[in-house]
Each structure stands twice: as C-alpha cells, then as structure tokens.
C-alpha cells in the first residue's frame, strides 16, 4: 500500500478482534519507530510504557473514556478490547515536550501499527493518576496519552463534508463507524 492509502486506512479503532494477541515485541517495535522521529530542540522528553498483559490491560481499560460522541457506550465489550497499550508520558526532568512531539509520536505509532494490519485509538481522556498507580510510575512522569492497540474488528468509513457541516462521528444501524472529514478544497485558506 502506498503512503496515501496507509494514511487513509489509519482510522481510529474502538473495537478489536480479541482472538488475536498483541505481544510485548509488537509494542516495543512501535516505540522503536518513535525514537527516529523529530523532537523539538531534540529534547526527547517523551517516555513510554508498553503493556500486553491481560490482567494489567483490564485495569488500564477501566481508566479510559471511549468515544465521547457515541452516547450510552462505555467502550468495547469483552472480546472486542485491545490486546495491548502504549502509554505516553512526559518526563518533567527534561522539561515539557513540544506539543508537536506528542502528535508526531502518536501518529508514528498509529501508522506503524496500521502498516502491520493493526489499529489504534489515541486517547487523551483517561484517569491519569490511576494509570500511574497501576503501572507504579514515578512522580517525574506525567501521563499524556493512552494508545490501545489491536487488530481492527470494526469497519470505518470517511464521509466527505464541508466547513460548517456536522463533524461528529457516529455508528449507523449496521455498526459501521462514520467519520466526517472536511474536503481538501475547504481546508485551503487561499485558493
């Protein structure tokens, strides 16, 4: 698949095939990709925790807030939950990471996972103190993102919209997840 196809296929995934496992090495390989990416002032202030243990996965799962636009849904059911997690932290000993670094790292993990047939959900809304307790993380590390990873179970489609249209993603009656995306022409400030 070429790069454009990779990017277009890299959709947020919230339901995973629970029969397929994610290994510690799978997660380590994704974090390894991040170390090659740019970092503002070359601070490299991001740190990562990788979790592929079912018991710890279950604890992490309970700290996450899934799909804010989908009402009455608390996240994937048993058998559709992620097989692993990458947790992203800022190390305060190195100063705050540039916000761009966080986005670059998350997108690199997402694209790396997608290139291997996996999918992720980049989550910023979670119980950060509970994550630190579960993982036994020190005071110098502040949680920034939780990235569940697994093999996708859901179908996600992109719906073209224009500026001003409703941007809320939704699931239709067939459980197909629709993600509205503004058309390229409307993104341009000077045409």
What residue ranges belong to the model's regions?
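Acidic, surface-exposed loops and disordered segments
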Residues: 1-191
């Amino acid at each position: 698949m070429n790069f454009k196809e990779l990017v277009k296929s890299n959709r947020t995934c919230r339901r995973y095939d629970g029969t397929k496992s994610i290994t510690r090495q799978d997660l380590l390989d994704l974090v390894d990709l991040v170390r090659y990416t740019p970092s503002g002032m070359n601070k490299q202030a991001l740190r990562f925790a990788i979790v592929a243990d079912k018991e710890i996965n279950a604890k992490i799962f309970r700290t996450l807030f899934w799909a804010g636009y989908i009402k009455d849904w608390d996240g994937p059911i048993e058998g559709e939950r992620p097989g692993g997690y990458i947790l992203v932290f800022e190390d305060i000993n190195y100063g705050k990471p540039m916000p761009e670094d966080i986005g670059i790292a998350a997108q690199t993990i997402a694209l790396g996972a997608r290139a291997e047939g996996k999918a992720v959900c980049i989550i910023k809304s979670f119980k950060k103190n509970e994550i630190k307790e579960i993982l036994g993380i020190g005071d110098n590390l502040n949680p920034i993102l939780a990235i569940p990873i697994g093999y996708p179970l859901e179908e996600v489609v992109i719906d073209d919209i224009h500026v001003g249209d409703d941007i809320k993603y939704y699931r239709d009656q067939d459980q197909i997840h629709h993600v509205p995306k503004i058309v390229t022409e409307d993104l341009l400030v000077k045409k």
